Amino acid sequence: MDLRELIEATKNSSKEQILGRIENVLKILEKEKKDDLAIIQPKNSLIVVGDLHGDLESLIFILENSNFFGTKDKIIFLGDYGDRGEYSAEVYYLLLTLKENFPGRVFLLRGNHEFPKGLEVYPHDLPFWLAKKYKSEEVYERIKEFWSYLYASALVEEKYLFVHGGIPVDLSSIEELRNASKLHPEKSFLEEILWNDPDEIENFLPSPRGAGNVFGKSVTEKVLKMVKAKTLIRSHEPVGIRVNHSGLVLTISSTKVYGTCAAYLKINLEEETKNAFELAKLASRF
């Protein structure tokens, strides 16, 4: 499958086809996923994609310009696939197709818009876009099941930690990352992974979003040391590219639905680990 075929299949997809994709991807994830933390091997390059929010045009641009189909590179999506953008249904179909066809190269993280029960978001127009395209409520119900199979975080050992929002402020072991979903809602680890934001403070404060926390540099330093990573890469904010905590944190957004610039990143995992300032210079803005 090449990109042109994928775009055509996505635009012409039917209810039966997307339900089939979901079923096939769930089977893949059942075999692949041992816990909430994906371990990515430090081979080849890794394409990093932030929030998409139904922005099919930006997703296609990234796949084309990163040359995903012409290489053995891996790609990680940091969550928030639907809502806000009118092509949310198509974005889901395309991502499911990528995972089905390239299971070992595609990593899908959970964002706050792929919420567990009790952490619902607003606005949430994904059900509308799915029903409009596929004339069915069943697709949305299956998509919600798919969310529960997504990774909460990913790690390239000794190099990079990936989450959608941020790192839990009271995290005491890597096992709590691995079991974030199982511990929810008794523990707030999953909520914070999906909702937290970095800021230039020392410790942490409750988030003005109403869920999660705002975390400071000391939290970042503690968690990166704990999981044996050097740079945190996350999304969750429509900033294009931003650096926090003296180069320890990189925020990347890959959607234009907010009217802002978008970006993606391609990291050579076989090279020396880069800090967020160095990664920001490598990012492709569009």
Q: Which residue stretches match the model-derived regions?
A:
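Feature recognizes metal-dependent phosphohydrolase scaffolds
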Residues: 1-286
